[in-house]
């Protein structure tokens, strides 16, 4: 389970330390790919394989399906953590997410996201502005 928000440095080689609390869930490997809203998404390999099966089962006659498959699969990088608990984010993915020397790693339960700090601040501002909508969603769940 991925929970919390962490700020970490990206070194000159593009390596990013994964939060210690996330590492056990990534022992089997991690897949990083393009995410929504110009971030990156990270998945444990088993969760990625489940998602890939489901997305691959969608009808390819649909333009939306093809675009989703391109977004997820064409930029995906399958990797393992190094001894220091870091991953090497490929240059094309760093450029996509506009990552510099800092990144925010945000846990989202079954996966995590990697954000440029400036973009993450915009996400937090939007969440604040939509708090009442989120409360309604929780009410729909009878929570």
UniProtKB/Swiss-Prot annotation:
GO MF: DNA-binding transcription factor activity; transcription cis-regulatory region binding
Subunit record text: Forms oligomers.
PANTHER family: TRANSCRIPTIONAL REGULATOR MRAZ
InterPro entries: MraZ (IPR003444), MraZ_C (IPR035644), MraZ_dom (IPR020603), MraZ_N (IPR035642), MraZ_sf (IPR038619), SpoVT-AbrB_dom (IPR007159), SpoVT-AbrB_sf (IPR037914)
Gene coding for it: mraZ
Subcellular location: Cytoplasm, Nucleoid
Protein name as it appears in the record: Transcriptional regulator MraZ
One Pfam family cited in the UniProt record for this chain: MraZ
GO cellular component: cytoplasm; nucleoid
Keyword Transcription set for record: yes
Stored PROSITE patterns: SPOVT_ABRB
GO biological process terms on file: negative regulation of DNA-templated transcription initiation
Primary site of residence: cytoplasm
Keywords attached to this entry: Cytoplasm, DNA-binding, Repeat, Transcription, Transcription regulation
Source species, domain of life: Bacteria
Domain SpoVT-AbrB, chain residue ranges per copy: 5-47, 76-119
Record family assignment: Belongs to the MraZ family.
């Amino acid at each position: 389970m991925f929970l919390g928000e962490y700020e970490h440095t990206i070194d000159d080689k593009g390596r990013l330390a994964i939060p210690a609390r996330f590492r056990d869930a990534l022992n089997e490997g991690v897949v990083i790919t393009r995410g929504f809203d110009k971030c990156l998404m990270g998945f444990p390999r088993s969760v990625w394989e489940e998602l890939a099966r489901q997305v691959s089962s969608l009808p390819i006659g649909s333009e939306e399906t093809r675009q989703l498959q391109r977004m997820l699969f064409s930029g995906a990088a399958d990797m393992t953590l190094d001894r220091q608990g870091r991953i090497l984010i490929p240059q094309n993915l760093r450029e996509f997410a506009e990552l510099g020397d800092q990144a925010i790693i945000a846990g989202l339960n079954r996966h995590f996201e990697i954000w440029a700090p400036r973009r993450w601040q915009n996400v937090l501002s939007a969440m604040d502005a939509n708090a009442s909508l989120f409360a309604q969603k929780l009410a729909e769940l009878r929570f």
